[in-house]
């Protein structure tokens, strides 16, 4: 069990690594993430676009699960949004959802898996 001084030190350390200017990401949003990839001695940014189906909030360890369908196969990736490997996050579209986790989209195909757009 951590005492209070150790917990404060950990919180101060976490504040240094939290990205301050992230867009507000909600469940159902379509996002475009730029992920840094190192191949040999080269570094490049690869973009990953999909729908946010889950989000786990826990300060520096906040993760989002992004799902996209590529050539008829569903692909899901979990991203730490405060990771230095994430170069950029852009919200392309907001969707109207009434669930905190959209795992039911895994069983839907084609037009059935579309979400209604939410305008702000």
From Swiss-Prot:
This is Large ribosomal subunit protein bL19c. Transmembrane segments: none annotated. Keywords: Chloroplast, Plastid, Ribonucleoprotein, Ribosomal protein. The keyword Ribonucleoprotein applies. Its main location: plastid. PROSITE patterns: RIBOSOMAL_L19 (PS01015). One of its GO terms (molecular function) is structural constituent of ribosome. It comes from Thalassiosira weissflogii (Marine diatom). GO terms for cellular component: chloroplast; mitochondrial large ribosomal subunit. SUPFAM superfamilies: Translation proteins SH3-like domain (SSF50104). One of its GO terms (biological process) is translation. Belongs to the bacterial ribosomal protein bL19 family.
């Amino acid at each position: 069990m951590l005492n209070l001084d150790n917990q404060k030190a950990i919180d101060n350390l976490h504040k240094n690594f939290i990205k301050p200017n992230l867009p507000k990401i909600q469940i159902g949003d379509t996002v475009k993430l730029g992920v840094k990839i190192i191949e040999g001695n080269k570094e490049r940014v690869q973009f990953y676009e999909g729908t946010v189906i889950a989000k786990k909030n826990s300060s520096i360890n906040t993760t989002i699960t992004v799902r996209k369908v590529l050539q008829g196969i569903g692909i899901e990736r979990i991203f730490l949004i405060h990771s230095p490997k994430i170069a950029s996050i852009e919200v392309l579209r907001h969707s109207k959802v009434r669930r905190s986790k959209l795992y039911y989209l895994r069983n839907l195909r084609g037009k059935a898996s579309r979400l209604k757009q939410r305008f702000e």
